[in-house]
Amino acid sequence: MNTRRLFARSRLQLAFWYALVMGGILTLLGLGVYRAIVQANWMALEREVESIAGTLHDSLEPMLPSNASPTGVLQKMLPDLCLVNQPCQVNPTLIERHTLGISDRSLYYIRLFDYQGNLLAFSPNQPASLSSIFNQETWQTIHPPTGDRYRQFTTILHSAGNTDKSSWGYLQIGRSLAAFDAENKRILWILGLSFPIALGLVAFSSWGLAGLAMRPIYQSYQQQQQFTANAAHELRSPLASLLATVEAVLRIDSSHSPEINTMLHTVERQGRRLSQLITDLLLLSRLEQETTAEDWRLCCLNDLVSDLTEEFLELAIAAHIDLSSDLSSGEVYAWGNESQLYRLVSNLIANAIQYTTAGGRVDITLTSHEQMAIITVQDTGIGIAPDQQEHIFERFYRVNRDRSRKTGGTGLGLAIAQVITVKHRGSLTVESALGKGSLFTIQLPIFSVPIVHS
């Protein structure tokens, strides 16, 4: 995979997780702040209602006689309240004389009950659907079928002449929660508007911080790649000299003992293997560092596969393996670097022959489907275990290490193939089963060639 794309994806993932974590923290913090504000407003509202109820209680209790008719007393004490089962005329000064400085008197209503829980009087502005059945709970939240919610407080009233402090009745005062609910909605709206802005700032900051975090890693990776390329480049010359010397000694002086000749042949073989490894490392490093497509041109995949089949035919015959190819009836073109595409397919064919036993088959096919060129290399070889299939495209990974050493494999062939495929905006997949062989599939975008009519 292209190095820049790899690090860009890692940076994006790091920024995403950072933004996700910070977004979760901001969400929890916002919910906590909202909950704290709502709770504070709720407690302030209850204190206000309780304070007003206490003031009314202290004002009414001294004027409540123990033996007078409740109806007659209430008509004299509270002429602006509506009595049960009597006509009610709304007086504009109704609550103003009895709510003692309430800022918005229309938000409140008052109800009086006798000690048996029978409704005696009520404010004309109480909710129309409010039940007349007495509920002795101190605090209640009233939910009328229509309209606003109310918070209701109930307290006991005692008559002035009652020495045993038995109950004369009950006072209920309720407050509309319309303003409270509207304030909560306003807070939610502010938080809902602020959250995307904050999340956007967090995402922007996350991207910058992820870049700062990835910079030393990227620099370290570049230094490692540069070191690998430099080391491989510096090793090529002395290694070439060593191989030339060994070949010259073997060719000119044949008087050595069999042991020395064997050692020289071993040195030559290992030197060539090391030379191939250096070549592969340089190629892999160059592929990962390339960012331009200057050498790309139109490539006929039919010719490429046909040439490779002919090239590997002799090797397959020597290994007693049946090598065949089945090309698409029409010409299939791709846009890319021809030498790299050649290396891509040749690595797969070489691997297939290497891991197929004598008497087996290697089949190469070229087809096209939905603007994609599909090249498959299928063998009847030893196969790949499921737990190894996800690692075979890693550098220096070998399925069968002993066999790779005997055949001179470097462990970079499939890694190079994967890098070339991704560089050409394609995909490389494998399907395999132990003892049944493997199927490698390359998919590359098709380059449509315009048809010129003569």
From Swiss-Prot:
Q: What is this protein called?
A: Sensor histidine kinase RppB
Q: Catalyzes what? A: ATP + protein L-histidine = ADP + protein N-phospho-L-histidine
What Enzyme Commission number(s) does the record list for this chain? Answer: 2.7.13.3
UniProt-listed NCBIfam families: hist_kin_RppB (NF041735)
Q: Which residues carry this modification: Phosphohistidine?
A: 233
Question: What is the annotated localization of this protein?
Answer: Cell inner membrane
Function, in words: Member of two-component regulatory system RppA/RppB, involved in the establishment of the appropriate stoichiometry between the 2 photosystems. It senses changes in the plastoquinone (PQ) redox poise. Another group shows this two-component pair, renamed NrsR/NrsS, controls the nickel-dependent expression of the nrsBACD operon; they suggest the photosystem-related activities seen earlier are due to the expression of NrsS (RppB) in the absence of its natural substrate NrsR (RppA).
Membrane topology qualifier: Multi-pass membrane protein
Which residue ranges run through the membrane?
A: 14-34, 187-207
Question: Signal peptide location in the record?
Answer: none
The entry lists its GO molecular-function terms as: phosphorelay sensor kinase activity
> Which residue stretches are annotated as topological domain Periplasmic?
1-13, 208-454
Taken from the record's topology, the Cytoplasmic segments are: 35-186
What is the induction comment? Expression of the rrpa-rrpB (nrsR-nrsS) operon is induced 3-fold by Ni(2+) and less by Co(2+). Autoregulates its own expression.
One Pfam family cited in the UniProt record for this chain: HATPase_c
Where does this protein come from, organism-wise?
Synechocystis sp. (strain ATCC 27184 / PCC 6803 / Kazusa)
Task: Outline the extent of the Histidine kinase domain.
Answer: 230-448
> What happens in the null mutant?
Little visible phenotype, except up-regulation of nblA, a phycobilisome degradation protein. A double rppA-rppB (nrsR-nrsS) deletion is less tolerant to growth on Ni(2+), no longer expresses nrsB (slr0793, involved in Ni(2+) resistance) in response to Ni(2+). Loss of expression of this operon. There are no growth effects, no changes in pigment concentration, no changes in PSII or nblA transcript levels seen in the double mutant.
Q: Cite the PANTHER family for this sequence.
A: HISTIDINE KINASE 1, TWO-COMPONENT HISTIDINE KINASE
Instruction: Provide this UniProt record's keywords sorted from A to Z.
Output: Cell inner membrane, Cell membrane, Kinase, Membrane, Phosphoprotein, Transferase, Transmembrane, Transmembrane helix, Two-component regulatory system
Lineage top rank: taxon: Bacteria
Annotated GO CC locations = plasma membrane
